[in-house]
C-alpha cells in the first residue's frame, strides 16, 4: 500500500515518540486537510511506520520560522533553518503541517 507522506528515517523516532509534531513542506504537499489520516513511511525505503492525523496546515515564510516551530520539530532554530535550506533550497513560501500520531 502506498504511503501518503514520507519522512527521512532520521525523523522516525521523534515522530513515534511524539516529540516531532509538525513538518514543514513546500507547496506540492500543502494539500492535506485537517482531520485527514496519512499513512506515513520512510523516504529512503517507503516502509510504513505509523498513521498521522493532520491537525492544521498553515502557510509560513522562511523568515517567519521561530523557536516554537523548532521546538515542534524537536531541533534548534538554527538546525531547522539548515534542514529546510538543504531540502528546499531557494524556496521561501512553505507550509507547516501540524499532526498527531494515531497508530503505530
Swiss-Prot record:
Q: Which NCBIfam families match?
A: PRK04980.1
What keywords does the record list, in alphabetical order? Hydrolase
UniProt superkingdom: Bacteria
Name assigned to this protein: N(4)-acetylcytidine amidohydrolase
* Record-linked InterPro entries: AC4CH (IPR008314), ASCH_domain (IPR007374), PUA-like_sf (IPR015947)
Report the record's disulfide bonds.
none
* GO cellular component term, pick one: cytosol
Enumerate the catalysed reactions.
Answer: N(4)-acetylcytidine + H2O = cytidine + acetate + H(+); N(4)-acetyl-2'-deoxycytidine + H2O = 2'-deoxycytidine + acetate + H(+); N(4)-acetylcytosine + H2O = cytosine + acetate + H(+)
Annotated ranges, domain ASCH: 6-102
User: What organism is the protein native to?
Assistant: Cronobacter sakazakii (strain ATCC BAA-894)
Q: Which SMART domains match?
A: ASCH (SM01022)
Residues annotated as catalytic: 20 (proton acceptor), 23 (nucleophile), 73 (proton donor)
